[in-house]
Regions:
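Metal-dependent nuclease catalytic cores that hydrolyze phosphodiester bonds in DNA/RNA
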Residues: 1-146, 255-256, 260, 264-277
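Metal-dependent nuclease catalytic regions and adjoining charged, substrate-binding loops involved
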Residues: 22, 110, 139, 169, ...
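Short connector loops/turns at beta-strand edges and beta->alpha or beta->beta junctions
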Residues: 35, 155, 195-196
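Short, solvent-exposed loop/turn segments at secondary-structure junctions
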Residues: 44, 162-164, 195-198
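Glycine-rich loops and low-complexity Gly/Arg-rich segments
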Residues: 55, 64-65, 150, 181-184, ...
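Solvent-exposed, well-ordered amphipathic alpha-helical segments
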Residues: 119-128, 150-157, 181-191, 203-210
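Non-catalytic protein-protein interaction segments used by genome-maintenance enzymes to assemble
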Residues: 132-179, 183
Length: 277
């Protein structure tokens, strides 16, 4: 990293998660919700994964096992359901709803990717990591990310399980795709959206234009971090408890709001000598 002093200063804070690099998730969170960005990367506290996020993780792993021939679809579904229940052992409300989506989403994902070939992973089974340097004028910073599925046919697919299939990719997903496409220009990057009833491949957004927007965001992020410490940001920027990021996150709300309280110095006991008569 070069000439981005704000990001560098946050990366050196004790307990900070602000590594001296950027990713699609870091950029998108900065664009979407500054207080949660402060909480995650500055204060170093994150929320527990909601049922929909856990559903997405177990489905992605299940689809990989089927495409690699390690499991049948039925076996993959059983394993995915077991993993989900390990996290949400008491299926209630949203967790029960997400549990019921696992089978149809695995089946449709495998159907969508059946002709793509066997995906390529690292020897230890982990996803392929991308890393390159983003530069503009006098500054530069590493960009990192992980690819869901890399196929021998020259395609990279990022799997998105959702209850509603979009007609156009969201800006946050376009930013993510642009980062991946820039890292692997010899491949075609697609996003596969899978609902319980259908699937669709999308690849929206002009990559050069999006990369210019990403550079602007990185510079804004650095300026923000230069002007405020995480504590100063928490004292200045209120959270919206009704937003997607903060809803039901009562522990994180408390931790964030505690940053506004003045730090009390520990009192040290001093011994006094009494004058003897």
């Amino acid at each position: 990293m070069k000439n981005l002093p704000g990001i560098r200063s946050w990366s050196k804070i004790h307990n900070s998660q602000m590594n001296p690099n950027v990713s699609a998730s870091k950029i998108n969170l900065f664009n979407a919700d500054i207080p949660m960005f402060v909480m995650n990367y500055g204060i170093g506290k994150r929320s527990e994964s909601p049922p929909a996020a856990v559903r997405g993780i177990v489905i992605e792993d299940a689809v990989a096992s089927v495409l690699q021939g390690r499991r049948s679809i039925d076996e993959a579904v059983i394993k995915a359901c077991e993993r989900f229940v390990q996290v949400f052992y008491a299926l209630q409300n949203d967790s029960h709803k997400q549990y019921n989506l696992i089978r149809p989403m695995i089946e449709l994902s495998c159907e969508a990717l059946k002709d793509y070939g066997i995906p390529i992973f690292n020897p230890d089974g982990t996803q392929e990591k991308i890393e390159y340097t983003l530069k503009q004028d006098t500054w530069e910073i590493p960009v990192v990310g992980y690819l869901d599925f890399v196929f021998p046919n020259g395609k990279i697919v990022d799997l998105k399980t959702t209850t509603r299939c979009p007609s156009v990719m969201s800006l946050s997903h376009q930013i993510q795709r642009a980062i991946y496409q820039t890292a692997r220009p010899d491949h075609e990057v697609e996003f596969l959206y899978v609902t319980p009833k259908k699937f669709q491949f999308l690849s929206d957004g002009d990559v050069p234009t999006l990369m210019d927007e990403i550079k602007t965001t990185v510079k804004r992020m650095d300026t923000f971090c230069s002007l405020m410490s995480p504590e100063q940001a928490a004292m200045s920027i209120p959270i919206n408890p009704e937003s997607f990021y903060w809803r039901d996150q009562y522990t994180l709300q408390r931790i964030y709001n505690e940053q506004t309280k003045p730090k009390t110095k520990r009192k040290t006991k001093t011994k006094t000598l009494e004058k003897m008569e």
